[in-house]
C-alpha cells in the first residue's frame, strides 16, 4: 500500500495554453501502474554481449498498460476504463476543456479505477507484428464521425465546448495503432488484467465494445459491462446472424460465435449508451449514417442477449430526454450527468 495521497486540491490540470483548474480534495490510498498480458518472442542463436545482434535476444510485446488508483473507503468492484479507436487512456482523464474526466468522477464515487492503454496503442506500443504509422490528415473526418457536427460547423445544442483551444486539445488526444488491430489480442490483454485484479466491471468506448464482449466470454472475473457507443464487433450466436447493414460509411457486418460462448454474455448485466444526432433513416451524411447502423445493430444485439435469458439494456439518450451528446459521452459537457446514469445502473445491478 502506498502512502495516502491528497490529490486535486492544488492539482494543476492543463486544458490548453494558460488554462488552470483546481478541484476539491480527493484521498487516494493506493496508486500505481503495470503491464498485463502480452507475449515474448525469442530469436534463435546466442546473444553476444560485446557484439550484439538480434541473435538470441527476446522481445516483449502485445501487453497492455494500466494506471490504477484506489480511493479511500473503496467499493469492492473496480472499473476498467477502456478507450476506443485512435485513443488512449487519456480519453478518461481530464476532458479537452479542462474538467474532471471519468477517471476522477468515478474515484469520487468510491470506485477503484484502472485506466488502460490497450495492446499496440499509447504506452503499450510494443507490437509483435509490424505496422507502419503514417502522418495521415484525418482531423475533419473525426470531427464528423464523432458527431461534433458537420465540419466546420457544430451541431446546434451539441454538448461540446466550441473554443478553438478545446478542439485543438481533442485533436491532440488522437494516437495511432502501432500494430494491426486484433480484437483477440486486446481481449487477452484485458483478461490478463482482470486475472490479476480480480472481479471487475468493464467500461468500454467505441471500438473497445467488441473486444469487451470477447473479454467477458474469456474471463468470468468480468462481472458487468458498460458500453459507450460500441462501434463494431457485435457477436451473435451461429445461426442467428442478422443481415449486414450498409451505410454511407461502409457496411457493418455482425460476427458469428458459438452459442456456448454467446451464452456467457447472458450471465452478466450489460448496458449500452448512445448519444444524439443519430438518424433513424439512411442519409448521405457519412458521419451520421455511420452511427445509424451501429445503433440499429446494437438494438438487435441487446434483443439477442435478452432472448437467450440475459440482462442487457440499450439507452438512446435522446429517448430519455438527454440531448446533444457526441460519440464521446464521457467527456461531453454533461459528463457528470452521464456518470450519474452509469452509477445508478451499477447500483441497481449490485455492481457497486
Language model features with spans:
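Conserved alpha/beta-hydrolase
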Residues: 99-125
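A conserved short beta-strand
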Residues: 220-235
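Conserved acidic catalytic loop of the alpha/beta-hydrolase fold
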Residues: 180-201
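N-terminal cap/lid segment of alpha/beta-hydrolase-fold proteins
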Residues: 23-74
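Short beta-strand element of the alpha/beta-hydrolase
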Residues: 76-85
Amino acid at each position: 500500500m502506498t502512502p495516502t495521497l491528497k490529490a486535486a486540491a492544488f492539482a494543476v490540470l492543463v486544458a490548453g495554453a494558460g488554462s488552470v483548474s483546481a478541484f476539491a480534495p480527493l484521498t487516494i490510498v493506493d496508486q500505481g501502474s503495470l503491464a498485463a498480458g502480452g507475449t515474448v518472442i525469442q530469436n534463435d542463436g546466442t546473444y553476444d554481449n560485446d557484439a550484439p545482434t538480434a541473435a538470441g535476444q527476446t522481445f516483449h510485446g502485445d501487453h497492455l498498460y494500466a494506471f490504477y488508483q484506489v480511493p479511500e473507503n473503496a467499493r469492492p468492484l473496480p472499473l476498467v476504463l477502456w478507450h476506443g479507436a485512435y485513443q488512449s487512456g487519456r480519453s478518461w482523464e481530464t476532458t479537452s476543456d479542462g474538467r474532471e474526466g471519468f477517471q476522477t468522477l468515478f474515484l469520487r464515487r468510491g470506485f477503484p479505477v484502472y485506466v488502460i492503454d490497450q495492446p499496440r496503442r499509447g504506452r503499450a506500443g510494443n507490437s509483435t507484428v509490424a505496422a507502419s504509422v503514417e502522418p495521415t490528415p484525418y482531423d475533419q473526418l473525426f470531427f464528423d464521425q464523432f458527431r461534433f457536427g458537420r465540419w466546420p460547423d457544430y451541431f446546434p445544442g451539441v454538448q461540446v465546448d466550441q473554443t478553438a483551444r478545446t478542439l485543438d486539445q481533442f485533436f491532440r488526444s488522437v494516437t495511432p495503432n502501432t500494430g494491426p488491430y486484433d480484437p483477440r489480442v486486446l481481449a487477452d490483454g484485458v483478461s490478463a488484467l482482470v486475472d490479476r485484479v480480480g472481479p471487475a466491471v468493464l467500461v468500454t468506448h467505441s471500438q473497445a465494445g467488441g473486444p469487451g464482449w470477447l473479454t467477458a466470454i474469456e474471463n468470468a472475473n468480468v462481472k458487468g459491462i458498460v458500453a459507450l457507443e460500441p462501434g463494431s464487433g457485435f457477436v451473435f450466436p451461429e445461426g442467428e446472424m442478422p443481415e449486414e447493414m450498409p451505410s454511407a460509411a461502409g457496411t457493418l457486418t455482425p460476427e458469428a460465435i458459438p452459442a456456448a460462448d454467446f451464452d456467457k454474455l447472458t450471465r452478466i448485466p450489460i448496458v449500452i449508451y448512445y448519444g444524439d444526432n443519430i438518424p433513424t433513416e439512411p442519409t448521405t451524411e457519412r458521419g451520421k449514417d455511420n452511427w445509424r447502423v451501429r445503433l440499429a445493430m446494437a438494438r438487435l444485439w441487446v434483443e439477442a442477449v435478452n432472448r437467450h435469458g440475459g440482462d442487457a439494456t440499450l439507452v438512446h439518450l435522446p429517448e430519455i430526454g438527454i440531448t446533444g451528446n457526441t460519440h464521446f459521452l464521457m467527456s461531453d459537457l454533461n459528463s457528470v450527468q452521464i456518470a450519474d446514469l452509469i452509477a445508478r445502473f451499477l447500483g441497481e445491478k449490485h455492481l457497486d
